[in-house]
Amino acid sequence: MGMTMIEKIIAAHTNRDKVKPGDIVNARIDFVLGNDVTTPVAVKEFNKIGIDEVFDQDRIAIVPDHFTPNKDIKSAEQCKFIREFARDKGIHNYFEIGEMGIEHCLLPEKGLALPGEIIIGADSHTCTYGALGAFATGVGSTDMAAAMATGYTWFKVPSTIQFVYNGELKPWVSGKDLILYTIGDIGVDGALYRAMEFTGETIENLSMDNRMTISNMAIEAGGKCGLIAPDEKTFKYLENRAQRDYTPCYSDDDAEYEKVIEYDVSDIEPQVAFPHLPENTRPISEEGDIKIDQAVIGSCTNGRMEDLRIAAGILKEKQVHHDVRCIVIPGTQDIYKQALKEGLIEIFIEAGAAVSTPTCGPCLGGHMGILARGEKAIATTNRNFVGRMGHPESEVYLANPAVAAASAIKGYIAHPEEVL
């Protein structure tokens, strides 16, 4: 019996010929990531270990993206603490304000997440890099500290659920809709501690930006990671980016899966996830014209160039509804610059949107768009838990960038066709 992609990656990092689901292993780590929320705790734990140096100054990234630019004194102190740690330890991939982006948009862009690697990050959406064929997963700050010290961490080898998507997507349906539909089907615990492997002709036809959106939300189904096999699109994306040599891994034809779930995507509409779980999905034809107060376009889920182009295409020569606050957040500085070159930022501003420097900001209820009691937002983010974007009595509806932009214009959750 052959091995799945996740099993092959783990075997290669544990000097084993074969691993199987349930094995407990100590694996070599290729890259370690932290942000301004999780790294301070990791640094404190690292300092307790009693060593002076990190395992590799080139294989750690610290990205202050959650509460930055610093929203208050506490966030400023946290960033100062991790900035000084990075300087003291000679960590080369510390991304300062003005250079940084949302971490899961930034690392692929910088060529720091690569096929066949094991990447851990003290952030749950580290699974984004599965779109590049990496076993990338979120860990706690203590595990981040240990990995910074040793270059290793332990895993229980997960079993794999394969998700096969076939058919042609309808207009205005994207990777965001595929993953929301999937989570709506299997539930927020439907892939608990499983490797989710996304495949099929539909996945092959998706852009890298859309693939990253899908892998990004694997954790919202409980997934340990969200893997997509590297192909020519992957290798093209990594040309002139990759900072290291890499070895892609692929599932064997006779690999054993826990289950295989198949979808015909041809009838899938744009999806909307209702409060207060990403599994509460409905096709947009059934959403019922829900009035909104805010629209957020951005995040590590949908803050990439393709997302901004789609949103700008909807908003061009139109106006945001007078009762709606529309916030657009490019994922990185390079994305911001490219959007400037293409005239997208001007489109957003002329439509009445506020355009922010890269930040996680409103996604986690941090800053730059907090909701008051009773307010409703449509967002291209990844979570809509109680109080996620502000007051516990506010509501967040998840959707793709086209739906978010159309809704900003109409003042209620709307299909893009309503404004075109």
From Swiss-Prot:
Subunit architecture: Heterodimer of LeuC and LeuD.
Keywords assigned: 4Fe-4S, Amino-acid biosynthesis, Branched-chain amino acid biosynthesis, Iron, Iron-sulfur, Leucine biosynthesis, Lyase, Metal-binding
Quote the PANTHER family the UniProt record gives: 3-ISOPROPYLMALATE DEHYDRATASE LARGE SUBUNIT 2, HOMOACONITASE, MITOCHONDRIAL-RELATED
UniProt-annotated binding residues for [4Fe-4S] cluster: 300, 360, 363
CDD domains xrefs? IPMI
Q: Which organism is the protein's source?
A: Halothermothrix orenii (strain H 168 / OCM 544 / DSM 9562)
Which InterPro entries does the UniProt entry name for this protein? Acnase/IPM_dHydase_lsu_aba_1/3, Acoase/IPM_deHydtase_lsu_aba, Aconitase_4Fe-4S_BS, Aconitase_4Fe-4S_dom, HAcnase/IPMdehydase_lsu_prok, Homoacnase/IPMdehydase_lsu, IPM_dehydratase_rel_enz, IPMI_cat
> How many cofactors are bound and how?
Binds 1 [4Fe-4S] cluster per subunit.
Q: Under which pathway is this protein filed?
A: Amino-acid biosynthesis; L-leucine biosynthesis; L-leucine from 3-methyl-2-oxobutanoate: step 2/4
SUPFAM superfamilies found in the cross-reference section: Aconitase iron-sulfur domain
Needed cofactors: [4Fe-4S] cluster
GO MF term set: 3-isopropylmalate dehydratase activity; 4 iron, 4 sulfur cluster binding; metal ion binding
Major enzyme class: lyase
Q: What's this protein's name?
A: 3-isopropylmalate dehydratase large subunit
Give the record's family classification. Belongs to the aconitase/IPM isomerase family. LeuC type 2 subfamily.
Q: Which residues cross the membrane?
A: none
**Role noted for this protein:** Catalyzes the isomerization between 2-isopropylmalate and 3-isopropylmalate, via the formation of 2-isopropylmaleate.
Q: What is its EC number?
A: 4.2.1.33
Q: Which NCBIfam families match?
A: hacA_fam (TIGR01343), IPMI_arch (TIGR02086), LEU2 (TIGR02083), PRK00402.1 (NF001614)
Catalytic reaction annotation: (2R,3S)-3-isopropylmalate = (2S)-2-isopropylmalate
Q: Name one GO biological process term.
A: L-leucine biosynthetic process
